[in-house]
Amino acid sequence: MAALRNATPFSYRQDPAVPAFPDDKPIFIFDGYCVLCSGGATWLMRHDKKRIFRMSTAQSSLGAALYAHYGIDWDATYLLISNGLPYTKSGGYLHMCAVVGGWWKAVLILYLIPRALRDWGYEIIARNRYRWFGKVEYCQMIPDDLKVTLLDTAAEDAAQPQRSAGGMSFSDAENAAISARS
């Protein structure tokens, strides 16, 4: 795996292209159009009983800016930022399970598998996720009781025409970019 650019703690705070956001908790940034990814985010919201995580989509202005800051393609992986550090692919999911705690810590046994092999498996799923699990035109609806974990980026994107669903907003340009990648 190529090293992430700017992978020092809280480096995004000095990047004027990254909108300010509360970073006192980990933030999970996912593909809002991917059924598997949105399902994973909903799973995290339901199992995060202590409300440790915040969420945003890769298609939001915050998500896009953070992906650009770290030099990664949102279509290749999700992004988890915890204690100001970026995590992606299998290592990020294992870190997330450790933070969620409970019996999910049992998943940490996967650290025994070399990262290259874990990430290879992750990349196969990531490349085929739309074909295997589907894709939605608009971000899926998030139940009201779980919306508290979402970072609201609508104000940042107010200058662009919006399509909104489940508390997450996407501009026509963002929707076109998603459609072009499928």
Where are these regions (language model features)?
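Active-site-adjacent beta-strand anchor residues
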Residues: 30, 56, 111
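Thiol-based oxidoreductase modules, predominantly thioredoxin-like and allied folds used
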Residues: 49-63
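N-terminal leader/targeting and pre-domain segments
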Residues: 2-14, 18-19
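Short coil/turn segments at beta-strand junctions that form active-site/ligand-binding loops
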Residues: 24-25, 51, 76
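Short cysteine/histidine-rich zinc-coordinating motifs and their immediately flanking basic loops
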Residues: 46-50, 150-152
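Local sequence-structure signature of Cys/Sec-based thiol-disulfide redox active-site neighborhoods
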Residues: 16-47
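Thiol/selenol-based redox catalytic cores and closely related redox-interacting motifs
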Residues: 61-182
